[in-house]
Amino acid sequence: MAQAWAFLLPVLVLGSYVTSLFFPSYISNPLCGGDGGRSLFLCAQAPKDQDPSPAVSTMYKTAFHFQPAKNWMNDPSGPMYFNGIYHEFYQYNLNGPIFGDIVWGHSVSTDLVNWIGLEPALVRDTPSDIDGCWTGSVTILPGGKPIIIYTGGDIDQHQAQNIAFPKNRSDPYLREWIKAPNNPVLRPDEPGMNSIEFRDPTTGWIGPDGLWRMAVGGELNGYSAALLYKSEDFLNWTKVDHPLYSHNGSNMWECPDFFAVLPGNNAGLDLSAAIPQGAKHALKMSVDSVDKYMIGVYDLQRDAFVPDNVVDDRRLWLRIDYGTFYASKSFFDSNKNRRIIWGWSRETDSPSDDLEKGWAGLHTIPRTIWLAGDGKQLLQWPVEEIESLRTNEISHQGIELNKGDLFEIKEVDAFQADVEIDFELASIDDADPFDPSWLLDPEKHCGEAGASVPGGIGPFGLVILASDNMDEHTEVYFRVYKSQEKYMVLMCSDLRRSSLRPDLEKPAYGGFFEFDLEKERKISLRTLIDRSAVESFGGGGRVCITSRVYPAVLADVGRAHIYAFNNGSATVRVPQLSAWTMRKAQVNVEKGWSAI
């Protein structure tokens, strides 16, 4: 239940806005607010009589990202592939574009691109979830039996885990779900546990003893932990006397995810099946407003996760995404033998903007996720199905970019585009020296350097959503540094000039990755532009950055531009540049239900 907990704070006046996400002070019911675990935010909902502005709603609404037709959404919850259908459940407010009154929204798809919106799968109608049906997971039990386990909050805002089953497994859409009569099946009643910091159960897996395991995000004796539980039947659970993993220096871990990966193999692994020799495990947690992870091994004898590298300073932990991305959830796709991950991307405009738009939040494009060949980090790439929306391909080869050059990528829709570009370095001798302290805050370094500050190698990359006079534009680019015997590449997504509006979050996101430039010489960049959502993948998915932008140029049809640029001293060659206009997907087309 990320529930935007890392971002939400109480507000006293509608429209007050800082770089954290604030909400208006409409209190929806007595269950909201109070002391305890909900003290960081207000449950609120929009006034019933306020209609969203059609112009604003459509200007920033995405064309091929997953989001409901209206209202608030946050965490992906329990994605799965079952009987030929992809299911995406998500945290949803039926009543408005503000966080609160959370239920499980439900949509289905056959291709991960076009989605049908259904009735909510879970609503808050029992004592154990009357405060909200928070984040959870789906596990498919032997015999093809899907089961939801999710966090619910009671009237006192204490958290516990609940179970639900499909009412009719022959229904291809699994529209109706029945809650277990013995809910909640897990309470935080062990010594040292915090009843308001106990949420977001993972997908289950089977251990060598044949028992099911599951992890739940929690706080144990003041430490953050992925708490470990065992069960014979997935209904009755016992807490293991030690966590799957814990850390004494970070906040509560939300939305933990635990899955197996094979180095250099982009095929997914099913946790409910035997894990092959040589496999690693990834433990992901949502903390510090971002999604971080560790690579290690699952020690079967100890029944514990053991990181390959223990890093005390969590600023140095690996990141799933370096931008506006949180509460991600992965699942094994048995259809194509891959692991897919989604994340929630919140709005970074103001609460009053969300009220005017009538919607807030979206999910990133589903990504295939796998372990790099060296076993050090996860790689991500948009699922291949998204390419079905490509049209009107534009291709260029052999472009040479000298210092100060701009090359316009014409004849594609600059508002809805997919751009893939390779940058080839003629020389690596001009790379500036690398300062290891930059790893502690790459965003700060992106902001200080900027795309306008020349370097030895770079900045070079893309300028997107640019107005005619460049008053508004977003830069996605690289800088190359020399670090002893290796090279470090900084990837930035700089939003500081993305909009002329002052009331927005406009940071410069950034992340570093190692690159063997002497061997590869080319650095790839793929950027998907979908109106207010921009997702960029650098170095073959080594660094991913999701950005939310709100330029006024979006209202001016046909007036935005995309450029390739170089502002570094060294010449950069572009051996291949391909760009496509992206068609609109059918996202959450209603089928017999008009509330979403």
Swiss-Prot record:
It is an enzyme of class 3 (hydrolase). One of its GO terms (molecular function) is fructan beta-(2,1)-fructosidase activity. It catalyses: Hydrolysis of terminal, non-reducing (2->1)-linked beta-D-fructofuranose residues in fructans. Residues 1-20 form the signal peptide. Glycans are attached at residues 168, 236, 248, 567. GO terms for biological process: carbohydrate metabolic process. It comes from the Eukaryota. Gene3D superfamilies: Exo-inulinase, domain 1, Glycosyl hydrolase domain, family 43. This is Fructan 1-exohydrolase w2. It comes from Triticum aestivum (Wheat). The lineage of its organism: Eukaryota, Viridiplantae, Streptophyta, Embryophyta, Tracheophyta. The gene is 1-FEHw2.
